[in-house]
Amino acid sequence: MRKSLLALSLLAATSAPVLAADYSDGDIHKNDYKWMQFNLMGAFDELPGESSHDYLEMEFGGRSGIFDLYGYVDVFNLASDKGSDKVGDPKIFMKFAPRMSIDGLTGKDLSFGPVQELYVATLFEWDGTDYKTNPFSVNNQKVGIGSDVMVPWFGKVGVNLYGTYQGNQKDWNGFQISTNWFKPFYFFENGSFISYQGYIDYQFGMKEKYSSASNGGAMFNGIYWHSDRFAVGYGLKGYKDVYGIKDSDALKSTGFGHYVAVTYKF
Protein backbone atom coordinates (compact mmCIF):
# COMPACT_ATOMS: atom_id res chain seq x y z
CA MET A 1 0.00 0.00 0.00
CA ARG A 2 1.31 3.43 -0.95
CA LYS A 3 2.06 5.54 2.11
CA SER A 4 2.66 9.24 1.61
CA LEU A 5 4.85 11.56 3.62
CA LEU A 6 1.66 13.25 4.74
CA ALA A 7 0.30 10.05 6.22
CA LEU A 8 3.55 9.23 7.99
CA SER A 9 3.88 12.74 9.35
CA LEU A 10 0.35 12.68 10.70
CA LEU A 11 1.01 9.29 12.26
CA ALA A 12 4.18 10.58 13.90
CA ALA A 13 2.33 13.62 15.19
CA THR A 14 -0.71 11.82 16.59
CA SER A 15 0.43 8.35 17.69
CA ALA A 16 0.74 7.81 21.43
CA PRO A 17 2.73 6.03 22.56
CA VAL A 18 5.29 5.95 19.74
CA LEU A 19 6.88 2.52 19.48
CA ALA A 20 10.50 1.80 18.73
CA ALA A 21 11.42 -0.11 15.59
CA ASP A 22 11.04 -3.85 16.18
CA TYR A 23 12.20 -6.28 13.49
CA SER A 24 12.47 -9.35 15.71
CA ASP A 25 9.61 -10.97 13.74
CA GLY A 26 11.81 -10.98 10.62
CA ASP A 27 9.48 -8.73 8.60
CA ILE A 28 11.87 -5.95 7.59
CA HIS A 29 9.45 -4.56 4.99
CA LYS A 30 6.50 -3.85 7.28
CA ASN A 31 7.43 -0.16 7.55
CA ASP A 32 8.09 0.40 3.82
CA TYR A 33 6.89 3.61 2.16
CA LYS A 34 7.95 6.07 -0.53
CA TRP A 35 7.23 9.62 -1.61
CA MET A 36 8.30 12.13 -4.25
CA GLN A 37 7.52 15.77 -4.93
CA PHE A 38 8.60 18.69 -7.10
CA ASN A 39 9.27 22.06 -5.48
CA LEU A 40 9.42 25.29 -7.47
CA MET A 41 11.67 27.46 -5.32
CA GLY A 42 12.65 31.08 -5.04
CA ALA A 43 15.75 31.95 -3.00
CA PHE A 44 16.54 35.46 -1.78
CA ASP A 45 19.85 36.55 -0.21
CA GLU A 46 21.09 32.96 -0.07
CA LEU A 47 24.52 32.67 1.52
CA PRO A 48 27.36 32.66 0.91
CA GLY A 49 27.34 35.63 -1.42
CA GLU A 50 23.73 36.88 -1.04
CA SER A 51 22.49 35.12 -4.18
CA SER A 52 18.86 35.46 -5.33
CA HIS A 53 17.59 32.96 -7.90
CA ASP A 54 14.97 30.39 -8.86
CA TYR A 55 15.32 26.63 -9.04
CA LEU A 56 13.35 23.41 -9.42
CA GLU A 57 13.87 20.71 -6.81
CA MET A 58 12.94 17.06 -7.18
CA GLU A 59 12.73 15.74 -3.61
CA PHE A 60 12.17 12.12 -2.63
CA GLY A 61 12.50 9.60 0.13
CA GLY A 62 11.24 6.39 1.63
CA ARG A 63 12.00 3.12 3.30
CA SER A 64 12.62 -0.33 1.84
CA GLY A 65 13.59 -3.04 4.29
CA ILE A 66 16.68 -2.00 6.21
CA PHE A 67 17.32 1.00 3.95
CA ASP A 68 16.06 4.51 4.61
CA LEU A 69 16.55 7.19 1.94
CA TYR A 70 16.22 10.94 1.54
CA GLY A 71 17.48 12.97 -1.39
CA TYR A 72 16.97 15.80 -3.82
CA VAL A 73 18.18 17.16 -7.15
CA ASP A 74 18.19 20.93 -7.73
CA VAL A 75 18.19 22.51 -11.20
CA PHE A 76 19.08 26.22 -11.11
CA ASN A 77 18.06 29.18 -13.28
CA LEU A 78 15.29 27.36 -15.11
CA ALA A 79 14.72 30.09 -17.70
CA SER A 80 18.48 30.53 -18.32
CA ASP A 81 18.08 34.19 -17.39
CA LYS A 82 21.29 36.06 -18.23
CA GLY A 83 20.65 38.35 -15.25
CA SER A 84 20.38 35.51 -12.72
CA ASP A 85 22.88 35.27 -9.88
CA LYS A 86 23.40 31.65 -10.97
CA VAL A 87 24.79 32.51 -14.41
CA GLY A 88 28.13 30.72 -14.81
CA ASP A 89 27.52 28.50 -11.77
CA PRO A 90 26.87 24.74 -11.88
CA LYS A 91 23.39 24.00 -13.23
CA ILE A 92 22.68 21.06 -10.92
CA PHE A 93 23.25 20.13 -7.28
CA MET A 94 22.43 16.70 -5.84
CA LYS A 95 22.24 15.36 -2.32
CA PHE A 96 21.55 11.72 -1.39
CA ALA A 97 21.35 10.52 2.21
CA PRO A 98 20.84 6.74 2.46
CA ARG A 99 20.86 5.13 5.90
CA MET A 100 21.01 1.44 6.80
CA SER A 101 19.08 0.35 9.89
CA ILE A 102 21.26 -1.45 12.42
CA ASP A 103 18.08 -2.64 14.16
CA GLY A 104 16.79 -4.13 10.91
CA LEU A 105 20.17 -5.62 10.01
CA THR A 106 20.56 -7.39 13.36
CA GLY A 107 16.88 -8.14 13.96
CA LYS A 108 17.22 -6.63 17.43
CA ASP A 109 15.51 -3.72 19.14
CA LEU A 110 18.41 -1.36 19.92
CA SER A 111 16.27 1.51 21.19
CA PHE A 112 17.10 3.25 24.45
CA GLY A 113 15.55 6.28 26.11
CA PRO A 114 14.28 8.63 23.39
CA VAL A 115 16.37 6.90 20.68
CA GLN A 116 14.00 4.78 18.57
CA GLU A 117 16.33 3.32 15.93
CA LEU A 118 20.03 3.34 14.98
CA TYR A 119 21.54 3.54 11.49
CA VAL A 120 24.77 3.53 9.55
CA ALA A 121 24.29 6.97 8.01
CA THR A 122 25.80 8.25 4.77
CA LEU A 123 25.51 11.48 2.79
CA PHE A 124 26.67 12.23 -0.76
CA GLU A 125 26.86 15.73 -2.27
CA TRP A 126 27.70 16.51 -5.92
CA ASP A 127 27.28 19.45 -8.27
CA GLY A 128 28.20 17.58 -11.45
CA THR A 129 31.26 19.65 -12.34
CA ASP A 130 34.86 18.57 -12.84
CA TYR A 131 37.36 19.60 -10.17
CA LYS A 132 39.99 20.11 -12.89
CA THR A 133 37.92 22.89 -14.49
CA ASN A 134 36.06 24.13 -11.39
CA PRO A 135 38.15 24.45 -8.19
CA PHE A 136 34.93 24.95 -6.20
CA SER A 137 33.39 21.70 -7.45
CA VAL A 138 31.37 19.83 -4.81
CA ASN A 139 32.22 16.14 -4.35
CA ASN A 140 31.72 15.14 -0.72
CA GLN A 141 31.07 11.79 0.93
CA LYS A 142 30.08 11.56 4.58
CA VAL A 143 29.62 8.53 6.81
CA GLY A 144 28.77 8.01 10.45
CA ILE A 145 26.05 7.02 12.90
CA GLY A 146 22.41 8.00 12.56
CA SER A 147 19.33 7.79 14.74
CA ASP A 148 15.64 8.57 15.04
CA VAL A 149 15.02 10.39 18.31
CA MET A 150 11.69 11.24 19.94
CA VAL A 151 11.71 14.90 21.02
CA PRO A 152 8.90 16.53 23.05
CA TRP A 153 6.40 18.36 20.79
CA PHE A 154 8.44 17.69 17.63
CA GLY A 155 7.94 13.92 17.62
CA LYS A 156 10.48 11.93 15.59
CA VAL A 157 13.64 13.86 14.70
CA GLY A 158 16.43 12.48 12.56
CA VAL A 159 19.88 13.02 14.12
CA ASN A 160 23.04 12.04 12.23
CA LEU A 161 26.75 12.52 12.94
CA TYR A 162 29.15 12.17 10.01
CA GLY A 163 32.83 12.30 9.26
CA THR A 164 33.44 14.30 6.06
CA TYR A 165 35.57 13.02 3.18
CA GLN A 166 36.28 15.57 0.44
CA GLY A 167 36.51 13.55 -2.75
CA ASN A 168 38.25 16.26 -4.74
CA GLN A 169 41.04 16.66 -2.19
CA LYS A 170 40.99 12.97 -1.22
CA ASP A 171 41.19 13.91 2.44
CA TRP A 172 39.03 13.82 5.56
CA ASN A 173 37.97 17.25 6.76
CA GLY A 174 36.08 17.46 10.04
CA PHE A 175 32.60 16.38 11.01
CA GLN A 176 28.98 17.30 10.45
CA ILE A 177 25.94 16.92 12.69
CA SER A 178 22.58 17.08 10.96
CA THR A 179 19.03 17.08 12.28
CA ASN A 180 15.68 17.24 10.48
CA TRP A 181 12.06 17.45 11.55
CA PHE A 182 8.50 17.70 10.22
CA LYS A 183 5.85 18.79 12.72
CA PRO A 184 2.22 19.39 11.71
CA PHE A 185 0.78 21.75 14.34
CA TYR A 186 -2.48 23.19 12.98
CA PHE A 187 -5.16 21.15 11.21
CA PHE A 188 -8.06 22.30 9.04
CA GLU A 189 -11.44 20.59 8.69
CA ASN A 190 -10.67 19.62 5.08
CA GLY A 191 -7.64 17.57 6.19
CA SER A 192 -4.97 20.07 5.18
CA PHE A 193 -2.56 21.33 7.81
CA ILE A 194 0.24 23.74 8.62
CA SER A 195 3.64 22.35 9.58
CA TYR A 196 6.90 23.55 11.05
CA GLN A 197 9.63 21.75 9.13
CA GLY A 198 13.33 22.20 8.79
CA TYR A 199 16.84 21.06 9.45
CA ILE A 200 20.21 21.95 10.94
CA ASP A 201 23.54 21.17 9.24
CA TYR A 202 26.55 22.11 11.38
CA GLN A 203 30.16 21.38 10.45
CA PHE A 204 33.04 21.44 12.92
CA GLY A 205 36.67 20.43 13.20
CA MET A 206 37.44 21.54 9.63
CA LYS A 207 41.07 21.90 8.60
CA GLU A 208 42.60 25.33 8.09
CA LYS A 209 44.04 24.39 4.69
CA TYR A 210 40.53 23.82 3.32
CA SER A 211 38.44 26.29 5.34
CA SER A 212 38.80 29.83 6.64
CA ALA A 213 36.54 28.94 9.61
CA SER A 214 36.86 25.68 11.56
CA ASN A 215 33.12 25.44 12.14
CA GLY A 216 29.90 26.78 10.71
CA GLY A 217 26.48 25.79 9.49
CA ALA A 218 22.91 26.63 8.66
CA MET A 219 19.40 26.19 10.09
CA PHE A 220 16.25 26.15 7.93
CA ASN A 221 12.92 27.05 9.54
CA GLY A 222 9.92 26.47 7.28
CA ILE A 223 6.23 27.15 7.77
CA TYR A 224 4.24 25.25 5.13
CA TRP A 225 0.60 24.58 4.30
CA HIS A 226 0.02 21.01 3.09
CA SER A 227 -2.78 19.17 1.34
CA ASP A 228 -2.67 15.69 -0.17
CA ARG A 229 -1.27 17.00 -3.47
CA PHE A 230 0.06 20.49 -2.86
CA ALA A 231 2.13 22.53 -0.44
CA VAL A 232 3.02 26.22 -0.22
CA GLY A 233 5.58 27.57 2.19
CA TYR A 234 8.10 30.11 3.39
CA GLY A 235 11.48 29.34 4.90
CA LEU A 236 13.88 31.46 6.91
CA LYS A 237 17.43 30.12 6.79
CA GLY A 238 20.06 31.28 9.24
CA TYR A 239 23.76 30.98 8.39
CA LYS A 240 26.92 31.16 10.48
CA ASP A 241 30.25 30.90 8.59
CA VAL A 242 28.46 28.43 6.32
CA TYR A 243 30.61 25.75 4.58
CA GLY A 244 33.57 26.82 6.72
CA ILE A 245 33.78 30.22 5.03
CA LYS A 246 34.68 32.98 7.46
CA ASP A 247 32.24 35.88 7.18
CA SER A 248 33.88 38.96 5.66
CA ASP A 249 33.15 42.08 3.65
CA ALA A 250 34.46 40.30 0.57
CA LEU A 251 32.16 37.27 0.97
CA LYS A 252 29.20 37.31 3.33
CA SER A 253 28.62 33.91 4.94
CA THR A 254 26.71 34.85 8.11
CA GLY A 255 23.15 36.16 8.15
CA PHE A 256 19.72 35.18 6.86
CA GLY A 257 18.23 34.04 3.57
CA HIS A 258 14.60 33.67 2.55
CA TYR A 259 12.87 30.96 0.52
CA VAL A 260 9.40 30.50 -0.97
CA ALA A 261 8.13 27.21 -2.38
CA VAL A 262 5.21 25.79 -4.32
CA THR A 263 5.04 21.98 -4.26
CA TYR A 264 3.26 19.24 -6.18
CA LYS A 265 3.26 15.77 -4.59
CA PHE A 266 3.24 12.51 -6.55
Curated annotation (Swiss-Prot):
Location(s) in or outside the cell: Cell outer membrane
Annotated signal peptide: 1-20
Gene Ontology molecular function, alphabetical: nucleoside transmembrane transporter activity
GO CC annotation: cell outer membrane
Pfam families, A to Z: Channel_Tsx (PF03502)
Domain of life: Bacteria
Key words of the record: Cell outer membrane, Membrane, Signal
Function: Serves as receptor for a broad-host-range vibriophage, KVP40.
Similarity comment text for this entry: Belongs to the nucleoside-specific channel-forming outer membrane porin (Tsx) (TC 1.B.10) family.
Full protein name: Outer membrane protein OmpK
Organism per entry: Vibrio parahaemolyticus serotype O3:K6 (strain RIMD 2210633)
This protein's encoding gene: ompK
